[in-house]
């Protein structure tokens, strides 16, 4: 359930075949089994008979986690890509924002920078308050993060992409948000990242 002016919240249904974890749908199945179809059901609700919500976009991204079954992403020929790209994207640090939420608003802060890069004038706190998931009790629901951009009239979606896709977006002058996992130690459970903002994170 999502909306700007309601107590929004995700759910975590689960059965023998599949489960939802906040913003991610997982196929359980036996080893080697995958899904072949995806079906959406969207319900629009309003307490005012004269007002209806507007649905502009429904999207999903997928990733096959089985070895050797990666689904390639189509991108144009990359021979013309510049070696380096520097975008003048407005920057915020979540760690110097509202002290009560600053350490946990990486997604809203990132989306704020991307929206301001496209002409908006927002603060991370106001984006965070529109994004908060009352069931998950956090700000890291990426479905809600991109829905915030949609509420301002932008077309936005989360995407399992590779480095070439990111390079094309940057070369086209479009800022990109990344969700990363890393460890500050070479012996950590995630890929090692020197001088990372957090000691170790399963998602930042």
Region spans (language model):
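Short, amphipathic alpha-helical segments
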Residues: 30-34, 52, 105, 160, ...
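Non-cytosolic beta-sandwich-type ligand-binding/adhesion modules
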Residues: 1-67
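Extracellular structured ligand-interaction cores
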Residues: 35-39, 55, 103, 175, ...
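Conserved active-site-adjacent core of cysteine acyl-enzyme catalytic domains
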Residues: 117-203
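Active-site-adjacent structural segments surrounding the nucleophilic cysteine of cysteine proteases
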Residues: 43-138
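Surface-exposed intrinsically disordered loops and tails
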Residues: 8-14, 83, 88-97, 189-199
């Amino acid at each position: 359930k999502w909306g700007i002016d309601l107590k929004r919240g995700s759910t975590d249904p689960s059965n023998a075949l599949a489960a939802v974890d906040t913003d991610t749908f997982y196929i359980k199945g036996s080893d080697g089994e995958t899904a072949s179809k995806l079906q959406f059901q969207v319900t629009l609700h309003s307490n005012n008979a004269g007002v209806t919500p507007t649905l502009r976009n429904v999207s999903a991204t997928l990733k096959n986690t089985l070895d050797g079954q990666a689904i390639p992403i189509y991108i144009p020929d990359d021979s013309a890509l510049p070696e380096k790209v520097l975008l003048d994207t407005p920057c915020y640090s979540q760690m110097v924002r509202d002290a009560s939420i600053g350490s946990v608003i990486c997604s809203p802060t990132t989306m704020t920078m991307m929206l301001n890069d496209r002409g908006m004038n927002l603060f991370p706190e106001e984006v965070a308050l529109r994004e908060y998931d009352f069931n998950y009790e956090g700000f890291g629901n990426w479905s809600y993060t991109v829905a915030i951009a949609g509420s301002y009239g932008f077309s936005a979606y989360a995407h399992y992409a590779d480095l070439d896709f990111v390079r094309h977006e940057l070369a086209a002058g479009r800022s990109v948000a990344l969700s990363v996992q890393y460890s500050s130690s070479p012996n950590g459970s995630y890929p090692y990242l020197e001088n990372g903002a957090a000691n170790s994170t399963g998602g930042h």
